[in-house]
Amino acid sequence: MSRVGRLPIEIPNGVNVTVTPENVVTVKGPKGELTKAMHEDMNIAVEENNIVVTRPSENVQHKALHGLTRALINNMVVGVTQGYEKTLELVGVGYRAQLKGKDLTLNLGYSHPVEIKAVKGVEYKVPEPTKVVVSGIDKELVGSVAANIRVWRKPEPYKGKGIKYAGEVIRRKEGKTGK
């Protein structure tokens, strides 16, 4: 069995999990509700306070799907109970972030400010002008939105300027050496 897939997922108090015959998993919790369609080959069962994922065969594809399915369901359970957040840091002279309503405005050294519209299911917070916190209950969506913000100014290797994840180490290069 898959080392990840064989572990049961514990359902915390206040969380309700339903699985349809078409393998559509719905998880409701204190922070919200998530629904995701899983691969039809996987067998997903709710037993007492646990979710158990089993696979039909020892096929290589089924082994991979087994761990994936279990991880996706676990991410949904964690999302509706605790939520997810990614912190981005703006490094560079004049690089600033601010909220306008629910939308995010970034000054990144371009001739115009970058406007990032609010995405349903994701919330932006700006605790400092050089920090942006992207939070929500869907891990995939939070990561995707954070990556889309980072794309506007990826950190460059010479001075390290740009938008980076909190805790991300930028591989630095040495500049040209003079004579």
UniProtKB/Swiss-Prot annotation:
Highest taxon in the source lineage: Bacteria
Q: Which biological process annotations from GO are given for this protein?
A: cytoplasmic translation
State a GO cellular component annotated for this protein: cytosolic large ribosomal subunit
Which InterPro entries does the protein's record reference? Answer: Ribosomal_uL6-like, Ribosomal_uL6-like_a/b-dom_sf, Ribosomal_uL6_a/b-dom, Ribosomal_uL6_bac-type, Ribosomal_uL6_CS
Q: Which GO terms describe its molecular function?
A: rRNA binding; structural constituent of ribosome
The cross-references to PROSITE patterns, in alphabetical order and at most eight, read: RIBOSOMAL_L6_1
**What keyword terms does UniProt attach to this protein?**
Ribonucleoprotein, Ribosomal protein, RNA-binding, rRNA-binding
Q: Which Pfam families match?
A: Ribosomal_L6
Per the entry, what this protein does is: This protein binds to the 23S rRNA, and is important in its secondary structure. It is located near the subunit interface in the base of the L7/L12 stalk, and near the tRNA binding site of the peptidyltransferase center.
Tell me the protein family, please. Answer: Belongs to the universal ribosomal protein uL6 family.
How the protein assembles, per its UniProt entry? Answer: Part of the 50S ribosomal subunit.
Query: What name does this protein carry?
Result: Large ribosomal subunit protein uL6
Kindly list the organism's lineage. Bacteria, Bacillati, Bacillota, Clostridia, Eubacteriales
Please name the gene that encodes this protein: rplF
